[in-house]
Amino acid sequence: MTMSNFARFGAAAVVALFAMSPWVGTANADDPPKAEIDAMRKALSKYEDPYVAVRDLYLSTVGCVHYDGSTMEGHLQYAKGAMGVHFVNLTIQGPPDPLKPNVLIYEPVGNKLKLVAAEWLVPLAVAKERPSLLGQPFQGPMEGHEPLIPQGFHHYDLHAWLFKDNPLGMFSPTNPDVSCKDAQFSLMEMPTKLVAAP
């Protein structure tokens, strides 16, 4: 299977499986309790080994995603920085579970991948209201993040920098201290267009 066919298959699978998931949640801006954050780190620490993540069906999207800080009216504003390489688990469905993120994010460091964050995605089609996790409201709703996720996959998402400090805050989508300089495939993405909530 060629890389472009693999990417198209993966993107289509992301849309299909997430669209079938019933998601719920409410928005609240409270800081998450330290005990819950510690529990998340403990549960997800096994994925510091990316091979364990692959065995648990987290599949790499290959490209290291970063942003130049550009702003565009009507688009989500991402501070200059990177996210990293996303590993997506298409089998995780249902309400956002702090111990089972849909996405693990790795930073390329030399010839290794270092776990830095987790991400949860909620399809707009099944969200009755803005979801939240640990009292943190999700961002969006927004279009899909092309080229990794098709534009038509409207969704909310939330990042949590559990394994690398982020000067912009634990739940900021980008981290200026994450770099894609060691990545074999680097993807400079533009800000994602916001869409209307139902």
Where are these regions (language model features)?
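Short, Lys/Arg-enriched N-terminal segments with co-localized hydrophobic residues
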Residues: 1-2, 25
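Bacterial N-terminal signal peptides that target proteins for export
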Residues: 2-13
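Bacterial N-terminal signal peptides
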Residues: 12-22
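Sec/Tat signal peptide C-region and signal peptidase I cleavage site
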Residues: 23-29
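Primary mode marks residue(s) on the alpha4-beta5-alpha5 output face of response regulator receiver
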Residues: 30-198
